[in-house]
């Protein structure tokens, strides 16, 4: 279904607390549309984003009726986390002939109207999108940006509503949602087997990425991370002569190599694209790759418009050095009584490994206390042995019951406790609390000066920081 956004006034979002849906709601709100929504009463970090944008929302999604609204709406946008045919509000909208689009369909519609840059990958797409949005914004290019988290450089917002034709968007591979998007430029950060409830094997996931590459507009630009062997395999299967492919990475397999990588205090320093001694404020090596992907995209865009990245060298280096992070990505929450408190969204074994090793390497003398909440039954079951291995990197581990997605109806108790028992055999400093809040007093008794406490996962254990 195609929608003329110029003719719309009021847009209602079903599942408005989802990271991407929230960002889209904020984006369209900033564009002048009247926006409201509905979701569950559970607290998410997106509550703060919506409240800061003065977007009102209901919290009774399973009982909600359009009759509760005091105005009519021109469009209903829904999150794929919910069954389109299972919610009363969507069934009512269908009966009333109100246009209904998924979040991904709306992004697709918008992408066809702009010079669109899509960022995709199993890991790092949120950070890369944020980096690219910050760079374009600080260079005065007035971009439109939608990213799946709160970005401090956006004023703790998750979207920028610019006045240019540039549309920078984080796009997701789950259920092939990114196939709605039609980019002029596409950045691929990496590919890892994930979303096992939908992709029955790695080959199915790989095929989805190849399909996405085929969505590139004619003479489009593809940027890939050549440090990722799976992306190199995908690159070898591309059968389009009308697109331009560029690679970057820390090895000499790439067209554009990152070099001179050293750690200096809280910065990673490196050289890229002829810019020397870039100081990136981060504790994680993979953020060098994410920033370099964004920098390469910016450079290619500038060159196509008769400019050079060297014209903006001072601004680029300032962005890197002053980078203040994004919500739930190795986020420093606070320091209190000698304890560092952090939060991270990592929920796949590869992400967990990279984040924990990065933190251990940076904070060499800290005891790492990890509070982890597994996310989705299917992911935990599929990567069970990998979770056992990577969660042992922490010095002390606190586990909780699996946080199920809205699409799952499994009982998580048995698998959650099995994960705990298997890790406990290897690391005796492993503890289990089915409910997050039941662990508060234990954690308080555990922490001493010199510790680093980090909550991790795509569940809701981040709420612990409100009590510690």
UniProtKB/Swiss-Prot annotation:
Coiled coil: none annotated. It catalyses: UDP-N-acetyl-alpha-D-muramate + L-alanine + ATP = UDP-N-acetyl-alpha-D-muramoyl-L-alanine + ADP + phosphate + H(+). Transmembrane segments: none annotated. This is UDP-N-acetylmuramate--L-alanine ligase. Cell wall formation. It is an enzyme of class 6 (ligase). Its EC number is 6.3.2.8. Keywords: ATP-binding, Cell cycle, Cell division, Cell shape, Cell wall biogenesis/degradation, Cytoplasm, Ligase, Nucleotide-binding, Peptidoglycan synthesis. The keyword Cell cycle applies. It is found in: Cytoplasm. ATP binds at residues 121-127. It holds the Pfam family Mur_ligase_C. Pathway: Cell wall biogenesis; peptidoglycan biosynthesis. One of its GO terms (biological process) is cell wall organization. One of its GO terms (molecular function) is ATP binding. Gene3D superfamilies: Mur ligase, C-terminal domain, Mur-like, catalytic domain, NAD(P)-binding Rossmann-like Domain. Belongs to the MurCDEF family. It comes from Borrelia garinii subsp. bavariensis (strain ATCC BAA-2496 / DSM 23469 / PBi).
């Amino acid at each position: 279904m195609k929608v003329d956004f110029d003719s719309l006034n009021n847009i209602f979002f079903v599942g408005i607390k989802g990271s991407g849906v929230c960002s889209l709601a904020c984006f369209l709100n900033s564009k002048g549309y009247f926006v409201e929504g509905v979701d569950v009463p559970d607290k998410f970090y997106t509550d703060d984003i919506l409240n800061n944008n003065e977007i009102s929302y209901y919290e009774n999604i399973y009982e909600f009726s359009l009759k509760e609204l005091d105005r009519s709406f021109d469009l209903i946008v829904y999150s794929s986390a919910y069954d389109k045919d299972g919610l009363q509000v969507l069934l009512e909208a269908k009966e009333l002939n109100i246009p209904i689009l998924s979040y991904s369909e709306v992004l697709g519609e918008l992408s066809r109207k702009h010079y669109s840059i899509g960022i995709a990958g199993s890991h790092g797409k949120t950070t890369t999108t944020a980096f690219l949005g910050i760079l374009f914004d600080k260079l005065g290019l007035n971009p439109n940006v939608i990213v799946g988290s709160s970005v401090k450089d956006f004023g703790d917002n998750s979207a920028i509503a610019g006045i240019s034709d540039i549309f920078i968007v984080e796009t997701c591979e789950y259920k092939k949602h990114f196939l709605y998007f039609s980019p002029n430029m596409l950045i691929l950060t990496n590919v890892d087997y994930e979303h096992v409830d939908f992709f029955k094997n790695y080959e199915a996931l790989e095929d989805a990425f190849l399909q996405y590459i085929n969505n590139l507009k004619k003479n489009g630009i593809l940027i890939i991370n050549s440090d990722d062997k799976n992306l190199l395999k995908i690159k070898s299967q591309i059968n389009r002569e009308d697109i331009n492919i560029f690679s970057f990475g820390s090895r000499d397999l790439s067209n554009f190599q990152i070099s001179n990588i050293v750690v200096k205090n809280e910065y990673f320093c490196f050289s890229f694209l002829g810019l020397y001694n870039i100081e990136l404020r981060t504790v994680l090596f993979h953020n060098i790759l994410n920033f370099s992907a964004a920098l390469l995209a910016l450079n290619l865009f500038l060159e196509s418009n008769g400019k050079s990245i060297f014209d903006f060298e001072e601004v680029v280096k300032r962005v890197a050095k002053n980078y203040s992070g994004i919500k739930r990505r190795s986020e420093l929450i606070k320091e209190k009584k000698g304890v560092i408190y952090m939060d991270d969204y990592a929920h796949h074994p590869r992400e967990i490994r990279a984040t924990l090793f990065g933190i251990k390497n940076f904070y060499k003398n800290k005891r790492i206390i990890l509070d982890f909440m597994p996310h989705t039954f299917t992911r935990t079951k599929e990567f069970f042995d990998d979770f056992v291995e990577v969660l042992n990197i922490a010095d002390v581990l606190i586990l909780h019951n699996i946080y199920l997605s809205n699409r799952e109806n499994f009982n998580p108790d048995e698998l959650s406790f099995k994960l705990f028992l298997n890790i406990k055999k290897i690391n005796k400093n492993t503890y289990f609390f089915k409910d997050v809040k039941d662990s508060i007093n234990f954690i308080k008794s555990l922490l001493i000066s010199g510790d680093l406490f980090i909550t991790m996962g795509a569940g809701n254990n981040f709420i612990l920081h409100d009590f510690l």
